[in-house]
């Protein structure tokens, strides 16, 4: 069975990379595609079968030592959702569904939305998220029933028989019509989820300062744009994360890099930062590999091939090294490890290139994930900036008895640097060994030894390269 073999191979691929979280896309499904799909599965019998299948999938994934976090979109729904039913999917179903709020004023879901006019039947005067009529915004403040329902959803999926391991919350700061209610809701949501499953993680999507939500009573952590994706992208590529802008003054600028990282890390707090979702790419932004070609634009104007041209794998490997050695939870967007390119949504949601993967990048990701797994200090150790110059950064991860040093040269020239690694607790004449190096043309995991002099590491760096060294283990 080809479908069984496909699923088996996919699970094996994900398992091989399971130390880094893998973000799986929902694909490029616009409203028309979603509507077509719902027409096939809207029967209650099919929905029950789908839930049972999902519970089994989670069980199988857990048996393989992996975890599952599901996406909760609680700020808005689709216009095709049964609560709104603008496309008349449920009203035309053979099953007995209540009418949607779009269709009739008397709909039991009327209070779930904010309407501005009285034009029933088929009232299109509802509030859409950011004005999108395909994404009706939910109106919690005027519907206790809606709030209770979503809190029940929060409990349901982290409980038996589904037992998922947490929630990723879509545009979480936008929920509700006031900041006060937003905080009130997420406090209730946290209590509901943690009572059902104390180990379930609550991970929010938010752009900007998340300090107020990360005080221990709402979100556990966030998708880390401000203290990871953006500073890494600016430093290594000079590009904005949608590929909408190129800023030469940010490219190779260590002051901006460390300044942005440290300021935003401090705003998050240690516990939240230690488990933050550190991504290079995702379903809302251009692929990191595409950002390395410095092409500004989107697929509608440039076409998909422009995203593939003149990409720089050496810069991409630098980024992956940072991702796997920086504090936080490294999260791979499916296909990045195989060399998938793409401009921002929808081009970033290309299918996985089965049989056409970049084999070198696959091997590299396996090795760099193995490095992350085998060096506990990279997961739980302290962090310190050690060195900076134009195009060059160095930092350390360390504990009472271990240390790892990371050095990146994003420039077009070879350089020699002298780094005060004694600040990580290494002895003044300690021995360290290189455990990974990336460069133009590939990477190596061959070992190479260095001896510190007066607590400093003197090392030559190839152009567009990254080096990872650790305390020599006798």
Which residues does each predicted region cover?
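Conserved alpha/beta catalytic core and glycan-binding cleft of carbohydrate-active enzymes
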Residues: 80-83, 186, 190-191, 199-346, ...
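Substrate-binding cleft of carbohydrate-active enzyme catalytic domains
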Residues: 33-88, 92, 101, 108, ...
């Amino acid at each position: 069975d080809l479908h069984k073999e496909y699923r088996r191979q996919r699970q094996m691929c994900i398992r091989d990379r399971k130390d880094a979280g893998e973000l799986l896309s929902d694909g490029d499904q616009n409203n028309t595609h979603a509507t077509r799909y719902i027409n096939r599965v809207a029967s209650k019998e099919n929905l029950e079968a789908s839930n049972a299948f999902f519970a089994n999938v989670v069980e199988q994934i857990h048996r393989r030592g992996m975890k599952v976090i599901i996406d909760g979109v609680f700020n808005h729904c689709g216009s095709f959702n049964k609560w709104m039913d603008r496309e008349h999917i449920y009203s035309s179903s053979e099953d007995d569904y209540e009418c949607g709020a779009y269709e009739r004023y008397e709909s039991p879901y009327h209070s779930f939305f904010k309407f501005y006019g009285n034009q029933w039947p088929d009232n299109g005067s509802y509030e859409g998220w950011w004005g999108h009529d395909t994404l009706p915004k939910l109106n919690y403040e005027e519907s206790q029933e809606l709030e209770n329902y979503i809190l029940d959803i929060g409990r349901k999926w982290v409980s038996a028989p589904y037992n998922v391991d947490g929630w990723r919350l879509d545009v979480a700061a936008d929920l509700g019509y006031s900041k006060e209610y937003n905080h009130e809701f997420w406090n209730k949501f946290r209590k509901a989820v943690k009572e059902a499953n104390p180990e379930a993680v609550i991970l929010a999507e938010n752009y900007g300062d998340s300090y107020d939500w990360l005080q221990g009573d709402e979100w556990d952590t966030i998708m880390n744009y401000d203290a990871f994706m953006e500073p890494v992208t600016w430093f290594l590529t000079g590009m904005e994360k949608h590929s909408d802008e190129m800023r030469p003054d940010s490219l190779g600028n260590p002051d901006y890099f460390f300044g942005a990282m440290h300021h935003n890390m401090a705003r998050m707090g240690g516990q939240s930062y230690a488990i933050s979702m550190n991504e290079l790419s995702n379903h809302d932004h251009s692929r990191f590999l595409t950002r390395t070609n410095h092409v500004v634009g989107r697929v509608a104007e440039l076409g998909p091939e422009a995203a593939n041209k003149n990409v720089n794998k050496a810069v991409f490997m630098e980024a992956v090294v940072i991702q796997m050695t920086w504090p936080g939870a490294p999260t791979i967007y499916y296909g990045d490890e195989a060399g998938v390119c793409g401009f921002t949504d929808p081009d970033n949601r290309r299918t996985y290139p089965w049989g056409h993967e970049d084999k070198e990048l696959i091997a590299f990701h396996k090795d760099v994930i193995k490095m992350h797994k085998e060096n506990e200090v990279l997961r739980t150790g302290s962090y310190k900036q050690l060195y900076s110059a134009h195009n060059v950064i160095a930092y350390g991860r360390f504990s009472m008895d271990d240390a790892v040093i990371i050095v990146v040269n994003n420039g077009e020239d070879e350089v020699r640097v002298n780094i005060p690694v004694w600040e990580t607790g290494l002895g003044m004449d300690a021995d360290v060994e290189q455990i990974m190096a990336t460069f133009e043309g590939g990477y190596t995991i061959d070992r190479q030894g260095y001896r510190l002099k007066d607590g400093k590491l003197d090392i030559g760096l190839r152009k567009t390269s990254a080096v990872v060294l650790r305390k020599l283990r006798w």
